[in-house]
């Protein structure tokens, strides 16, 4: 019973996201949706002077915020795990 309720709720959420995506014509839809859901606007790199998760960066320069490192392979800031 709990599993069917969870699946029904997950289906409704998925239907909402797909419906919203089909109406949206902006190219930055995924980031916009995450911004609205998790209020990521407070964490944009322009406001804090350093680059956050997923922002493009140049390896060797210390552009990423603390706890993030510039990936030399992908050239974007990712979580630094200390390895």
Curated annotation (Swiss-Prot):
Q: Which InterPro entries match?
A: Huwentoxin-1 (IPR011696), Huwentoxin_CS1 (IPR013140)
- State the family it belongs to: Belongs to the neurotoxin 10 (Hwtx-1) family. 15 (Hntx-3) subfamily.
Please indicate if the UniProt record lists DNA repair as a keyword: no
Role noted for this protein: Selective antagonist of neuronal tetrodotoxin (TTX)-sensitive voltage-gated sodium channels (IC(50)=1270 nM on Nav1.1/SCN1A, 270 nM on Nav1.2/SCN2A, 491 nM on Nav1.3/SCN3A and 232 nM on Nav1.7/SCN9A). This toxin suppress Nav1.7 current amplitude without significantly altering the activation, inactivation, and repriming kinetics. Short extreme depolarizations partially activate the toxin-bound channel, indicating voltage-dependent inhibition of this toxin. This toxin increases the deactivation of the Nav1.7 current after extreme depolarizations.
Q: What keywords are annotated for this sequence in UniProt? A: Amidation, Disulfide bond, Ion channel impairing toxin, Knottin, Neurotoxin, Presynaptic neurotoxin, Secreted, Signal, Toxin, Voltage-gated sodium channel impairing toxin
Key word Disulfide bond present: yes
Misc remark: Negative results: has no activity on Nav1.4, Nav1.5, Nav1.8 and Nav1.9 sodium and calcium currents.
Organism, per UniProt? Cyriopagopus hainanus
Leader peptide range in chain numbering = 1-21
User: What is the protein's name according to its record?
Assistant: Hainantoxin-III
Report the locations given in the UniProt record: Secreted
The subunit field of the Swiss-Prot or TrEMBL record says: Monomer.
Domain description from the entry? The presence of a 'disulfide through disulfide knot' structurally defines this protein as a knottin.
User: Using the chain's own numbering, where are the disulfide bonds?
Assistant: 50-65, 57-70, 64-77
**Residues the record lists as Leucine amide modifications:** 81
Q: Which terms in the GO cellular component ontology are assigned?
A: extracellular region; host cell presynaptic membrane
| Removed propeptide positions | 22-48
Citing just one GO molecular function, the answer is: sodium channel regulator activity
Q: In which tissues is it expressed?
A: Expressed by the venom gland.
């Amino acid at each position: 019973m709990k599993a069917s309720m969870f699946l029904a709720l997950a289906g409704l959420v998925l239907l909402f996201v797909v419906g919203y995506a089909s109406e949206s014509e902006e190219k930055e839809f995924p980031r916009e949706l995450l911004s609205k859901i998790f209020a990521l606007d407070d964490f944009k790199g322009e406001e804090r002077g350093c680059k956050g998760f997923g922002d493009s960066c140049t390896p060797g320069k210390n552009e990423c915020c603390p706890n993030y490192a510039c990936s030399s392979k992908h050239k974007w800031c990712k979580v630094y795990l200390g390895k």
